[in-house]
Amino acid sequence: MLKILSTQLTGVFQRISTQEEEQFEDAARLLAQAVISNGTIFIYGIDEMEAVAAEALYGAEKLPNVKRLDINEVKTADRVLIVSRFCTNEEAIRIAKQLQEQNIWTIGMSSIIEETTQTLVDYVDVHIDLCLKQPLVPAEDGTRIGFPSAVAALFAYHSLALMTQEIVAEYE
């Protein structure tokens, strides 16, 4: 079962890397703009995606000027990263709408599932699909288990952080 999980997770990482390459570049540019202009990068992780906020705030290779989102502190030079399991998360959509009304550049990170009337994708400037729609490992009873959404989000975050650091280094 461990080998299946490892293989499936590698596939998720590959899909994120190839399908979302343009979105990573756009999102990294937005974050680099905040770093270069002494703005703040605000992070908001919903439920298990709080792992991304923890990594951004306390990880070994933090981006500069990162804070947990306080919507009342956000200014136009700042950028916001909202991370949720699925693009249909109501809390993520509500926050993204507020930020859009304030003309704040916002990046969303979530798995895109069946389109409904509104999704996070509709209210952010750049969206990175986490490409994880169902559990990865088939169980003996025909169901599936193993839904590592936070692992996919951490991979996407680290990819984004590396690209952002590269852009900032080129600027300096």
Q: Model-found features: residue ranges?
A:
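Glycine-rich phosphate-binding loops that contact phosphosugars or nucleotide phosphates
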Residues: 39-40, 46-165
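Generic N-terminal amphipathic, Lys/Arg-enriched alpha-helix
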Residues: 1-18
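Short, flexible loop segments at the rims of nucleotide/cofactor-binding pockets, characterized by
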Residues: 17-21, 83-86
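Short, contiguous, pocket-lining structural segments
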Residues: 1, 23-26, 48, 152
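Long, low-complexity, intrinsically disordered N-terminal extensions of eukaryotic proteins, enriched
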Residues: 5-7, 21-24, 72-74, 89
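A short, well-structured juxtamembrane/interface segment
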Residues: 19-36
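Short, surface-exposed alpha-helical recognition segments that flank or form part
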Residues: 18-22, 148-151
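Internal, active-site/partner-interface "lid" segment
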Residues: 10-13, 136, 165-172
